[in-house]
From Swiss-Prot:
It is found in: Cytoplasm. NCBIfam families: metG, metG_C_term, PRK00133.1. This is Methionine--tRNA ligase. Homodimer. Zn(2+) binds at residues 146, 149, 159, 162. A motif ('HIGH' region) lies at residues 15-25. It comes from Escherichia coli O127:H6 (strain E2348/69 / EPEC). The lineage of its organism: Bacteria, Pseudomonadati, Pseudomonadota, Gammaproteobacteria, Enterobacterales.
Length: 677
């Protein structure tokens, strides 16, 4: 059946840029990729995009902990994420970042339109504030005793013991997760998105029939409890985009994160030199289809805030949300101590990507059900289905074709009716792929694989091969087996991209959905090479052990300059502005009699001389070598009376001390007296 080609934009939820990709993430990206690959096989124009979610307090604080800039951290994490997704053959057309110029412009545009349309409100709120770190504390950065069940060490938004939700101000004996200090209440003006204004539109969207039943039911609960205005701003310090005309105020990460879908697509259009497609996909009356694959934990943002933001800023809404459940391993939540919290990169060190792609696909449906990765069942299913049923079908027939018939298949089908049974299944299997009933598709394909192997067992080519005058029968039987293998691999192509490549090389033809209507007759195949290897529990044991070792390594004490000399408490800009740093010329440097640590430096500040004692003698045993160098000094430090005289400032140096200390110097061109700004 010929289909009309559609324009489709598909996204996965944006991974947060402060941690590695794990097998929980991979469920969604594999699910989306299988669906996208099927759509492409059917001739549709699909743009498949993603990006890193790169803003927020957790990223700012982790970068500080690592002693690097947030930009450096998210850049390194993006490379790691993209490597992992490529390793699992996720066929993204573009992978970008929310910390991009495209995303900044689109975030400001959407905010400005919402504000102009009256959907942004201002009001002053009271929040918990860390007096030591000088920052307002997000809910998850406050811990204390649950006000309901009195369980200790609970986060500021909900209790993991009794499940209660509450405000962080309701916590008993709250503490800052950042510094351990007791937070204080402080007022701040915040910006709110008027979500209740979109209640009628959102309810109509919910009743349209497009959303999964479980999602629609959950949304109805939210409507009944009443929609609230959404706080879309955060106070400095914060890593993100500053709100236009609001110094010190930043967009909350969940405002610019979904806009990252648009930003990544805009980046793709710009790379292609295509100025038309962005509007074609995102304008209000777009006929293109837009699908978001997401986990059930972020339905609230994608089903309420996101479509309302788009509606209020005159952009199109999603065609649908495809929501999935969580991943458990061996029937339990992923556990670092048990070695079942498995990173994507660790998996690829022990198994190929196709194995996990197949197992997840076999368990997925269109419902929001959790998926259990039972590692013993995983080994059994991969071996039983991929190796024994599919690959074995090719191997048990290819040898005869290669050896006895120079790789040439028979000119007629041995069993046209059986072949028709296989090709007629395209409609049912295609519908299963289309509707995300992946488990059903796999069951249909494996039922066909059983039929194919039963045919070979009944025809017994290994017996026919020994009988005189039956060469034509042998060629026909084995050619039939290879043609059935070709159909099976065509149906499995969205799931097993690497195995498909090897199968296409053997079959000497590309596997296409419509191509199976015409069997390979009189066609020459290539010499058969092993297509897939069996897996065993020893690989699983090695995988689990490797995951445990990674946890131990991550928990090991951090070494290096930051560990030896941690960053001091946060100061305000006003505190820093009090320090007057100046470029100084070292006119003279000499030993200080009676001291084995100090050098006496005579510094020229460009019109004023200073006498400074500095404890750098061990690092500079020849003080004459310092004469003529430029350095940086604290010029407004109060004079300090010492046994050897008065020190009138301090020079800047870095290092742990002793011989390992290094005097700081300005770049070429700086002159004595220049202020460091």
């Amino acid at each position: 059946m010929t289909q009309v080609a559609k324009k489709i934009l598909v996204t996965c939820a944006l991974p947060y840029a402060n941690g590695s990709i794990h097998l929980g993430h991979m469920l969604e990206h594999i699910q989306a990729d299988v669906w996208v690959r099927y759509q492409r096989m059917r001739g549709h124009e699909v743009n498949f995009i993603c990006a890193d979610d790169a803003h927020g307090t957790p990223i700012m604080l982790k970068a500080q902990q690592l002693g690097i800039t947030p930009e450096q951290m998210i850049g390194e994490m993006s490379q790691e994420h993209q490597t992992d997704f490529a390793g699992f053959n996720i066929s993204y057309d573009n992978y970008h970042s929310t910390h991009s110029e495209e995303n900044r412009q689109l975030s400001e545009l959407i905010y400005t339109r919402l504000k102009e349309n009256g959907f942004i409100k201002n009001r002053t709120i009271s929040q918990l504030y860390d007096p030591e770190k000088g920052m307002f504390l997000p809910d998850r950065f406050v811990k204390g005793t649950c006000p309901k069940c009195k369980a200790p060490d609970q986060y500021g938004d909900n209790c993991e013991v009794c499940g209660a939700t509450y405000s962080p101000t309701e916590l008993i004996e709250p503490k800052s997760v950042v510094s351990g200090a007791t937070p204080v209440m402080r007022d701040s003006e915040h910006f709110f998105f008027d979500l209740p204004s979109f209640s009628e539109m959102l309810q109509a969207w919910t009743r349209s029939g497009a959303l999964q039943e479980q999602v629609a039911n959950k949304m109805q609960e939210w409507f009944e409890s009443g929609l609230q205005q959404w706080d879309i701003s955060r106070d400095a310090p914060y890593f993100g985009f500053e709100i236009p005309n609001a110094p010190g105020k930043y967009f909350y990460v969940w405002l610019d994160a979904p806009i990252g879908y648009m930003g990544s697509f805009k980046n793709l259009c710009d790379k292609r030199g295509d100025s038309v497609s962005f509007d074609e996909y995102w304008k209000k009356d777009s006929t293109a289809e837009l699908y978001h694959f997401i986990g059930k934990d972020i339905v609230y943002f994608h089903s309420l805030f996101w479509p309302a933001m788009l509606e209020g800023s005159n952009f199109r809404k999603p065609t649908n949300l495809f929501v999935h459940g969580y991943v458990t391993v061996n029937g339990a939540k992923m556990s670092k101590s048990r070695g079942t919290f498995i990173k994507a990169s660790t998996w690829l060190n022990h198994f190929d990507a196709d194995s996990l792609r197949y197992y997840y696909t076999a368990k997925l449906s269109s419902r929001i059900d959790d998926i259990d990765l039972n590692l013993e069942d995983f080994v059994q299913r991969v071996n039983a289905d991929i190796v024994n049923k599919v690959v074995n079908l090719a191997s048990r027939n290819a040898g005869f074709i290669n050896k006895r018939f120079d790789g040439v298949l028979a000119s007629e089908l041995a069993d046209p009716q059986l072949y028709k049974t296989f090709t007629d299944a395209a409609e049912v299997i295609g519908e299963a792929w289309e509707s995300r009933e992946f488990g059903k598709a796999i069951r249909e394909i494996m039922a066909l694989a059983d039929l194919a192997n039963r045919y070979v067992d009944e025809q017994a080519p290994w017996v026919v091969a020994k009988q005189e005058g039956r060469d034509a029968d042998l060629q026909a039987i084995c050619s039939m087996g290879i043609n059935l293998f070709r159909v099976l691999m065509t149906y499995l192509k969205p799931v097993l991209p690497k195995l498909t490549e090897r199968a296409e090389a053997f079959l000497n033809t590309e596997l296409t959905w419509d191509g199976i209507q015409q069997p390979l007759l009189g066609h020459k195949v290539n010499p058969f090479k092993a297509l897939y290897n069996r897996i065993d529990m020893k690989q699983v044991e090695a995988l689990v052990e490797a995951s445990k070792e990674e946890v131990k390594a991550a928990a090991a004490p951090v070494t290096g300059p930051l560990a030896d000399d941690p960053i001091q408490e946060t100061i305000t800009f006003d505190d820093f502005a009090k320090v007057d740093l100046r470029v100084a010329l070292i006119e003279n440097a000499e030993f200080v009699e009676g001291s084995d640590k100090l050098l006496r430096l005579t510094l020229d500040l460009g019109g004023e001389k200073r006498n400074v004692f500095s404890g750098i003698r061990s690092a500079y045993p020849d003080p004459q070598a310092l004469i003529g160098r430029h350095t940086i000094m604290v010029a407004n430090l109060a004079p300090r009376k010492m046994r050897f005289g008065i020190s009138e400032g301090m020079v800047m140096a870095a290092g742990p001390g002793g011989k390992d200390i290094f005097l700081l110097s300005p770049d070429a061109g700086a002159k004595p007296g220049h202020q460091v700004k």
